[in-house]
């Protein structure tokens, strides 16, 4: 089956349209709904809209758009109707309803939700921090972090760091590997901001075997053997015991659920 092409078009960064598109895609079997997102942010002219229309015509793409300026929105609407293209106006119907409800015209300013206020800068800083200090790259990040995640391989440290960063938490993650001594600074920071991520031996074994298959390798590699996994788990327990930090079992939890548990713990202990 050919990939479904979706054009995300916006007169701002396009984050809202992309989130809605991805939310819709997530409701379908990925094997049956293979997709490709094409991004067209900062649309400012009719020529920009024409480019989107041409690509949609050439690729039979669905256009998902958030255009705030009335003239841009109207032009897009006319063009998709003219060429009978598949499209979804994310913001238009909602803004029309709100305008009618409050009997007031909207600002019609693209990107107003992303005004560069303190909260926005804090979020960007947190995202950059998570990238810079991913996988224990630099121990200098330890005292600067709001949260330090510890765990062996395949315990979702990186996606959790990114998820929490989007909640404006500066997160550093540190891999726990028997052959690598944890950074000295790990024992100097407040253990209340450390979270250890635990996973069951059975779940980890399945994940690692699947990972090896994806890499085209046999599932008998030492990386996925029970002996190696048990060695890593034992070492993990030893390090966590020395630090004295809380442990969250991620074996049966989604990223969002684990992140919420972490946030709850961190916020509870801020004032203690």
UniProtKB/Swiss-Prot annotation:
Its EC number is 2.7.11.32, 2.7.4.27. One of its GO terms (molecular function) is ATP binding. It catalyses: N(tele)-phospho-L-histidyl/L-threonyl-[pyruvate, phosphate dikinase] + ADP = N(tele)-phospho-L-histidyl/O-phospho-L-threonyl-[pyruvate, phosphate dikinase] + AMP + H(+); N(tele)-phospho-L-histidyl/O-phospho-L-threonyl-[pyruvate, phosphate dikinase] + phosphate + H(+) = N(tele)-phospho-L-histidyl/L-threonyl-[pyruvate, phosphate dikinase] + diphosphate. Pfam families: Kinase-PPPase (PF03618). Keywords: Kinase, Nucleotide-binding, Serine/threonine-protein kinase, Transferase. InterPro entries: Kinase-pyrophosphorylase, PPDK_reg. ADP binds at residues 151-158. Bifunctional serine/threonine kinase and phosphorylase involved in the regulation of the pyruvate, phosphate dikinase (PPDK) by catalyzing its phosphorylation/dephosphorylation. This is Putative pyruvate, phosphate dikinase regulatory protein.
């Amino acid at each position: 089956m050919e990939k479904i092409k979706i054009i995300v078009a916006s007169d701002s960064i396009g984050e809202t349209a992309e989130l809605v598109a991805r939310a819709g895609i997530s409701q379908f079997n990925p094997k049956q709904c293979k997709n490709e997102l094409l991004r067209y942010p900062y649309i400012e002219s009719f020529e920009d809209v024409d480019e989107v229309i041409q690509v949609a015509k050439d690729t039979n793409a669905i256009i998902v758009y958030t255009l705030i300026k009335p003239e841009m929105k109207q032009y897009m609407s006319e063009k998709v109707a003219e060429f009978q293209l598949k499209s979804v106006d994310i913001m238009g119907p909602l803004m029309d309803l709100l305008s009618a409800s409050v009997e007031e015209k909207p600002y019609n300013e693209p990107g107003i939700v992303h005004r560069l206020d303190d909260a926005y800068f804090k979020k960007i800083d947190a995202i950059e921090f998570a990238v810079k200090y991913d996988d224990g790259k630099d121990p200098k990040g330890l005292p600067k972090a709001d949260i330090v995640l510890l765990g062996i391989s395949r315990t979702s440290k990186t996606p959790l760091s990114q998820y929490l960063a989007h909640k404006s938490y500066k997160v550093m993650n540190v891999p726990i590997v028997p052959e690598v001594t944890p950074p000295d600074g790990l024992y100097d920071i407040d253990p209340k901001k450390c979270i250890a991520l635990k996973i069951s031996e059975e779940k980890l074994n399945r994940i690692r075997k699947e990972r090896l298959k994806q890499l085209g390798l046999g599932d008998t590699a030492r990386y996925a053997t029970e002996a190696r996994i048990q060695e890593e788990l034992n070492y993990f327990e030893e390090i966590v015991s020395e630090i004295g930090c809380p442990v969250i079992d991620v074996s049966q939890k989604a990223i969002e659920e684990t992140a919420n548990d972490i946030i709850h713990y961190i916020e509870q202990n801020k004032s203690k």
